[in-house]
A protein has these predicted regions:
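Extended redox/cofactor-interaction regions of prokaryotic respiratory oxidoreductases
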Residues: 7-114, 122-130, 142
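Basic, amphipathic alpha-helical segments enriched in Lys/Arg and hydrophobic/aromatic residues
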Residues: 2-11, 162
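Stable alpha-helical elements in mature extracytoplasmic
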Residues: 5, 90, 155-158
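Substrate-binding/catalytic subdomain of NAD(P)-dependent oxidoreductase enzymes
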Residues: 1, 27-30, 182-184
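Short beta-alpha connecting loops at secondary-structure transitions
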Residues: 125, 137-149
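N-terminal leader/propeptide and maturation segments of large enzyme subunits in energy/redox metabolism
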Residues: 145-184
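Structural motif
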Residues: 1-2, 66-67, 151-153
Length: 184
């Protein structure tokens, strides 16, 4: 809500009419990153349904139909209830009895509160990663500084363990964090 309030100020004050008085804009096309390399669409099997966060509420409520409806979902690095559009529809969809939700989170967020399974995820200083910043155009290396407390795991490790339990044998599911960074 804070972001919405701040980005409304230029409209409320009329500042948008003056050079430099507009809203904060950081469009994805300004990034010098090669998203097709970072996101590795070549690893997504052909025919896989992809749902954007902007469509999530409509998909979860059945307003927007998919070939195969979502019966289970895993959320990590996102809190759709507060970060996506149509929050009320997302809340309605998360309340479905037939939806199995897993959330990897640091805290019990608005979305994680609906999780059937809540996994303790590590924080930035506790994992090696590459970070796309919202404040500049650099791709930044994040080195691991401290060990994660308790049972917290980096997302990559959660997915490695999940892939192993589900029987995935592809090499990319076995990559270490460093290998993931090298191959992306």
């Amino acid at each position: 809500q804070a972001i919405r309030a701040v980005t409304s100020l230029p409209a409320l004050t009329g500042a948008w009419r003056h050079v430099g008085g507009g809203i904060l804009q950081f469009p994805v096309w300004e990034h010098p990153y090669k998203f097709d390399v970072i996101c590795r669409p070549d690893l997504i099997p052909e025919g896989t349904q992809v749902v954007n966060n902007l469509q999530l509420g409509r998909v979860l409520t059945g307003e927007q139909k998919l070939n195969v409806p979502i019966k289970s979902m895993m959320c990590w690095n996102t809190n759709p209830v507060t970060q996506a559009t149509e929050s009320e529809k997302i809340l309605e969809g998360l309340k479905r009895e037939d939806l199995f939700l897993v959330s990897a989170e640091h805290f019990i967020s608005d979305t994680a509160a609906f999780a059937d399974i809540l996994l303790p995820a590590s924080m930035g200083a506790e994992q090696e990663d590459m970070i796309l910043s919202w404040g500049h155009l650099y791709l930044t290396y994040n080195s691991k500084c401290v060990e994660s407390p308790g049972e917290c795991l980096p997302n990559n490790e959660i997915f490695r363990q999940l892939a192993k339990r589900l029987g995935y044998e592809e090499e990319n599911f076995k990559w270490s964090d460093s290998e993931c960074l090298e191959n992306y």
